[in-house]
From Swiss-Prot:
It comes from Bacillus subtilis (strain 168). This is Trigger factor. InterPro entries: PPIase_dom_sf, PPIase_FKBP_dom, Trig_fac, Trigger_fac_C, Trigger_fac_C_sf, Trigger_fac_ribosome-bd_bac, Trigger_fac_ribosome-bd_sf, Trigger_fact/SurA_dom_sf. Its EC number is 5.2.1.8. It is an enzyme of class 5 (isomerase). Coiled coil: none annotated. It is found in: Cytoplasm. It catalyses: [protein]-peptidylproline (omega=180) = [protein]-peptidylproline (omega=0).
Length: 424
């Protein structure tokens, strides 16, 4: 095999590959063995046609495509490795020369990983956020726990206040006409939650049970239903019931109800403080790492290939779809509800995708510049961690992953981030 790499504009180039005649002959032989099983000629059993007769009847050209299908998946990766390039998209293959008894020549037009010119990445001067947890933070968290344990109790008298839950009927009208989806009966709404159109909930404050009112609002310009967006509407509302939150006492009994591992409010308070400290620490760490990576990538010069951005966009869209599925929704329903098609979603994600790609390329370059390597022991430790997380034997994890090359690259990128943190 002979290989020639010609760099073209940007990150594109052409790989010219010559496969020796003997290797091409072997591929033709294998192609014949496959094709002959599907061909019938009078006087011969299927699969038993002599090679010479086959080529006389159909021509050797009938074997070329199958030979290429056998050859290219083997020879193209070899050529890539020999040329020392890292393609980031599928190659555009053109066969330049194909003839029985001769060498095969093909070209592959590909986009490769770009060169990274690193800027400053040490001493970036980014500090970690303060992770101090105050008594006020702890009390606010305990208050939130109280809120979550609150019971809704019917108010026998008094008017609607912020935070109350009202049970109401409503019907909406635009230009005097009722519209689809604008009517409900015995609907529970927490006033101040922002669940309804801006201005709707505010106008319920001060009403008493049994009250009726015309609530005048305007649909937001960006409202998902285009036929209602930006239009004024009137909702005829009737209040049936008003409920107020009744908070449990903040005492030892409350503490035991919240956490069976504690006996007193003091223990719950201490445990809450430690949990908040850990959460703040993790949040500050994540923010620091994100800011360092962003700054280092902003300082680097990289011509990011569109092919890499497109691949990242596809990955991000799949991640988004998985999150939707966890919420009981799918991408099709989301696009119908939001009025955005897949192309519009990708356009929204494009800037983040470009940042992700540039950040990853920068981290790979830092790992190379600083000679950061990943040992087999570190890979084994990561496999063990995954096995524990999924409650599976390590061998099963290894079989599922196959090659650990991608894991090594991921660990190397993590080491690059650790390096930024240590040398900030």
């Amino acid at each position: 095999m002979s290989v020639k790499w010609e760099k073209q504009e940007g990150n594109e180039g052409v790989l010219t590959v010559e496969v020796d005649a003997e290797t091409f002959k072997t591929a033709l032989d294998d192609a014949f063995k496959k094709v002959v099983k599907q061909v019938s000629i009078p006087g011969f059993r299927k699969g038993k046609i002599p090679r010479g007769l086959f080529e006389q009847r159909f021509g050797v050209e009938a074997l070329y495509q199958d030979a290429l299908d056998i050859l290219l998946p083997v020879e193209y990766p070899k050529a890539v490795e020999e040329a020392g390039i890292e393609p980031v998209d599928r190659p555009e293959i053109d066969v330049e020369k194909i003839e029985k008894g001769e060498s095969l020549i093909f070209t592959a037009k590909v986009t490769v990983k770009p060169e990274v010119k690193l800027g400053e990445y040490k001493g970036l001067g980014i500090e970690k956020d303060d992770t101090t947890v105050t008594d006020e933070d702890v009390q606010n968290e305990l208050k939130a726990l109280q809120e979550r344990q609150a019971e809704l109790v019917v108010k026998e008298e008094g008017a609607v206040e912020e935070g109350n839950t009202v049970v109401l009927d409503f019907e909406g009208f635009v230009d005097g006409e009722a519209f689809e989806g604008g009517k409900a009966e015995n609907y529970s709404l927490e006033v101040g939650s922002g669940s309804f159109i801006p201005g709707f909930e505010d106008q319920l404050v001060g009403l008493e049970a049994g009250a009726e009112k015309d609530v005048e609002v305007t649909f937001p310009e960006e409202y998902h239903a285009e036929d209602l967006a930006g239009k004024p509407a009137v909702f005829k509302v009737k209040i049936h019931e008003i409920k107020a939150k009744e908070l449990p006492e903040l005492d030892d009994e409350f503490a035991k109800d919240i956490d069976e591992e504690v006996e007193t409010l003091a223990e719950l308070t201490e445990k809450t403080k430690k949990r908040l400290e850990e959460a703040k620490e993790n949040e500050a760490d994540a923010k620091l790492r994100e800011e360092l990576v962003l700054k280092a990538s902003e300082n680097a010069e990289i011509d990011v290939p569109q092919a890499m951005v497109d691949t990242e966009l596809d990955r991000m869209l799949k991640e988004f779809e998985q999150r939707l599925q966890m919420q009981g929704m799918n991408l099709e329903l989301y696009t119908q509800f939001s009025g955005q098609d897949e192309a519009a979603l990708k356009e929204q994600m494009k800037e983040d995708a470009e940042k992700r790609v540039k950040s990853n390329l920068t981290l790979e370059a830092i790992a190379k510049a600083e000679n950061l390597e990943v040992s087999d022991e570190e890979v084994d430790a990561e496999l063990t961690k995954m096995a524990e997380a999924y409650n599976m034997p390590v061998e099963n994890i290894k079989q599922a992953i196959g090659s650990t090359d991608a894991m090594k690259e991921d660990l190397k990128v993590r080491k690059a981030i650790d390096f930024l943190v240590e040398n900030r």
